[in-house]
Regions:
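A short, basic N-terminal segment
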Residues: 1-55, 190, 194, 199-206
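Walker A (P-loop) ATP-phosphate-binding motif of ABC ATPase nucleotide-binding domains
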Residues: 58
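Hydrophobic anchor at the beta1->P-loop junction of P-loop NTPases
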Residues: 61
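Conserved glycine(s) of the Walker
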Residues: 66-69
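Hydrophobic positions on the alpha1 helix immediately C-terminal to the Walker A/P-loop
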Residues: 72, 76
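Walker A/P-loop NTP-binding motif
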Residues: 78-81
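Conserved nucleotide-sensing/catalytic segment adjacent to the nucleotide-binding pocket
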Residues: 88-155
Length: 206
């Protein structure tokens, strides 16, 4: 049985660390941090999943534009970098690579070797799922880059965090029943139902 990654700390401590990482990310973007009930709920769900047993081996952060999804993903990346959690068998420390969904399609067409490596990294963040072309053509061959990547990560049970503006129904329509059903098995869904932070008054853009 493949072990699931979990942060070795209490849920409350993970919440506090994630909050600090989000505040740092907002400050890095020269914005003003503003907490609210929606963000607190999202943080609580994220902290709970990261510290407790679950059959899911990934997270889907879904919701409208500009409401904190990408910020949450980047904050988690910064938290991992700061914690230096050791991997088994002296293989270094955990870290997550983040790529835009459109970059996955680009790699598939332009750098096959890098594409194969990306598919199999132990921790991957996919930002803006659904913005990429569904298919790419290379020398007459048609590929489905994101579908192929998600299929491989499902089969290998690899840790994956995804952000998307698509609803679950739109994901099913866009990627088909097979991928939608596999995502249901792969990921814990955290819904970002709040409005955009991309205003002159508020912060935490996503």
């Amino acid at each position: 049985m493949k072990a699931r990654f979990r942060i070795p700390m209490s849920e409350d401590k993970a919440y506090a660390y994630l909050l600090a990482a989000i505040m740092a990310e907002v400050e890095y973007r020269h914005r003003v941090f503003c907490s609210n009930e929606d963000m607190e709920k999202q943080l609580q769900e994220m902290a709970h999943w990261l510290t407790t047993p679950s059959s899911h081996f990934g997270i889907l952060l879904c919701g409208g534009c500009g409401n904190g999804k990408s910020t949450m993903l980047k904050a988690f990346q910064q938290l991992l970098n700061a914690l230096h959690i050791p991997k088994p068998y002296n293989e270094g420390t955990y870290g997550i690579r983040i790529v835009d969904a459109k970059y996955i399609a680009y790699l598939c067409k332009n750098n096959y070797e890098a594409d194969r490596k990306l598919i199999s990294v132990d921790m991957l963040g996919i930002d803006d799922l659904g913005t990429e072309p569904s298919e790419v053509m290379d020398y007459g061959n048609i590929y489905t880059p994101v579908i192929d990547l998600l299929t491989k990560r499902y089969e290998e049970q690899l840790f994956t965090i995804i952000t998307t503006n698509l609803t679950p129904q739109q994901i099913r329509e866009h990627y088909g029943d097979r991928i939608a059903d596999r995502l249901n098995e792969m990921v814990k869904k955290i819904v970002f139902s709040n409005g955009t932070y991309r205003t002159d008054q508020l912060a935490t853009p996503g």
